[in-house]
Amino acid sequence: MLFRSVTYVTGLLKGNLGTSLRTKQPVTKEVAGRFGNTVRLAFVTLLWSSVVGVLFGVWSGTHRGKWQDYTGMTIAVSGISLPSFWIGFLLIMLFAVKLRILPTTSGTSLKSLIMPSITLGVGIAAVIARFTRSSIIEVLKEDYVRTARAKGIKEKVVIWKHVFRNSMISVVTVVGLQFGFLLGGSVVTETVFAYPGLGSLLIESVNYRDYPAIQSLILIFSLQFIVINLIVDILYAVLNPEIKLQ
């Protein structure tokens, strides 16, 4: 058992993930063929969901207790509550079956990324919006914000120059963690849209009991999340001098 474990770890260090029982091809080759698709989907999803989430969060946070805040947070809670597979089926029925303006299954073109990206990004945008709102509210209580307002600086300048910049330091952490989730947590969405990514490859491997592929994919997902967390910690230290000093 010890010898087999050492042999397996040695193979991993050399980039050898074993041979797929289903295709008789090296698992490394299968992963390499789909890894780029998963990264592309994750990047597009994170890009638009971050922008939408931050804007909704700022909108709600700067209007705390008003109808703008209640509207924004109601939308955010709805986005978190809706299951991704239900959103996916709804999009397919509307845009692919009824309106016929988007493909039912996903390829690698930009148009085919729209529905999977929306399905994945709704919940992520909602999480970012709620976190941004909390961060905005906390920064608004700081003394330098009150000082800026007392000097007669325009409210828009105070919000975007002082409040927004400082609140984004903590939001970066959430965005980074969501990117790690997108790289490893898009299994359901990729399956619904038949998207050729690592998530759908994992489902195919499970259905065929392709244990070398399953083991390798779980390992890759874990390493991705660890690396993303490390990068987020480094970025947080760079953006926040207090963390760097500690």
Q: What are the language-model segments listed below?
A:
Residues F3-V6, G18-L21, I87-G88, P103-T105, ...:
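Short, hydrophobic secondary-structure boundary micro-motifs
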Residues F35-Q68, G107-Q246:
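Alpha-helical transmembrane segments of integral membrane proteins
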Residues Y8-T10, T74-P103, T119-G123:
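Membrane-water interface segments at the C-terminal ends of transmembrane alpha-helices
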Residues L12, N16, R22, P26, ...:
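Residue-level signal for pocket-adjacent positions within structured domains
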Residues K14, I87-G88, I137:
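Alpha-helical transmembrane segments and their lipid-water interface positions
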Residues M1-V54:
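An internal, D/E-rich "acidic patch" concept
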Residues R4-L17, V27, V31, T71-S78, ...:
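Hydrophobic alpha-helical segments of integral membrane proteins
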